[in-house]
Amino acid sequence: MEAVIKVISSACKTYCGKTSPSKKEIGAMLSLLQKEGLLMSPSDLYSPGSWDPITAALTQRAMVLGKSGELKTWGLVLGALKAAREEQVTSEQAKFWLGLGGGRVSPPGPECIEKPATERRIDKGEEVGETTVQRDAKMAPEETATPKTVGTSCYHCGTAIGCNCATASAPPPPYVGSGLYPSLAGVGEQQGQGGDTPRGAEQPRAEPGHAGQAPGPALTDWARVGEELASTGPPVVAMPVVINTEGPAWTPLEPKLITRLADTVRTKGLRSPITMAEVEALMSSRLLPHDVTNLMRVILGPAPYALWMDAWGVQLQTVIAAATRDPRHPANGQGRGERTNLDRLKGLADGMVGNPQGQAALLRPGELVAITASALQAFREVARLAEPAGPWADITQGPSESFVDFANRLIKAVEGSDLPPSARAPVIIDCFRQKSQPDIQQLIRAAPSTVHG
């Protein structure tokens, strides 16, 4: 039980963010499901075949008793389980098509969903923490060990002729830099002279006309993000900025997080609390103007993006007005240098247009804070304007629609409405009574009369 609770809690924290249920709530839900005979063991929760019966049973219980706590917890857990399963299938497909091995040839069906690795190893009493390399090694076909060399020198012992390393494995291929970034053009090329550089490490490469300078910051591969999203558009680059005692430093955004955010926007909508939590997490670091505009292009459609640009400009004008009144405003750099202006904050000043490196070098820490905060506030406004709350009162379960899909649509509409939080659960239960299919309504009519009162 404890192992399952830990696995489910971890999945909910990953896919639900701030709305994830506590371990206590998950444990109470699992205990109830076992008590009602819906689960033979806690690990049966991983089987998709048990999800619909659990949803129907918890819904009926909520309608009879008027308590929706377990139903709400199950809704979050179900969303996390579905997201984890979809991500697993996508990962296995990517491994197969890229020829990486360790994955299934075809995506698994609903009946063959696997338990998480942590749960499987806890059940066997073995140590937790098997690495991905170990799992891939177990699943990959066995190969006959043969001597392998690279060029004229053995990778393992460095001997040019007569190498005795019969079991030495081939070295990993050198990383080939993406053509998207000129600063990575020299990565992976062998040096004509001098000592060998460790494989996988980036070669220092000076900018044109500046010999001896350190390499530029690592950039997020937005081309990879675009491929994962199967979308077309101009190549984009992002550099989240972190300010420390030594000056600005850059850490690349994780493409997987951006892909997940775009998927959340597509499935949950802009007004969903889950969407807002993921956007706030991605924008918790200081971003450049180039960053925020490209991020919004990925997650917003053309019309919402135009609305966001207008709202962002209004927010930046507010910052400029405050900086004009106060010469020592953080956006003015505490009175050092020129005052901030709209061109600087939008990345349109000299040396910044289309140049994220120039933006990182010329923008002050206070300006970066203002840019990111204004972009986030503009996104909140667009979420309210571009995607008004759906009419939850008009939602009805379709003839061929599963109860789970109907419940998801209804809960999404109610959560995105202007109803106070205390009224949402009763409204959801009332809609279940009136808008569900006849068989569900029959169950409700068979319930005690207190449910209808």
Swiss-Prot record:
Q: Does the keyword tRNA-binding apply?
A: no
**Disulfide pairings:** none
- Pfam families cross-referenced by the UniProt entry: Gag_p24, Retro_M
Motif PPXY motif per UniProt: ranges:
172-175
Keyword line: Host-virus interaction, Viral budding, Viral budding via the host ESCRT complexes, Viral matrix protein, Viral release from host cell, Virion
Q: Where is this site: Cleavage?
A: 155-156, 166-167, 177-178, 239-240
Could you state what the record's PTM comment says about this protein? Gag polyprotein: Specific enzymatic cleavages in vivo yield mature proteins.
A cellular component annotation (GO) from this entry:
virion component
Stretches for region Disordered: 128-150, 181-217
Q: Which GO terms describe its biological process?
A: viral budding via host ESCRT complex
Q: Name one GO molecular function term.
A: structural constituent of virion
Composition-biased stretches, type Basic and acidic residues, lie in 128-141
Q: Give the source's domain of life in one word.
A: Viruses
InterPro entries reported in the protein's UniProt record: Gag_M, Matrix_HIV/RSV_N, Primate_lentivir_Gag_pol-like, Retrov_capsid_C, Retrov_capsid_N, Retrovr_matrix
What information about domains appears in the record's comments? Gag polyprotein: Late-budding domains (L domains) are short sequence motifs essential for viral particle budding. They recruit proteins of the host ESCRT machinery (Endosomal Sorting Complex Required for Transport) or ESCRT-associated proteins. Gag contains one L domain: a PPXY motif which potentially interacts with the WW domain 3 of NEDD4 E3 ubiquitin ligase (Potential).
- Other remarks? Gag polyprotein: This protein is synthesized as a Gag-vMyc polyprotein.
Q: What is this protein called?
A: Gag polyprotein
Q: Which organism is it from?
A: Avian myelocytomatosis virus 29
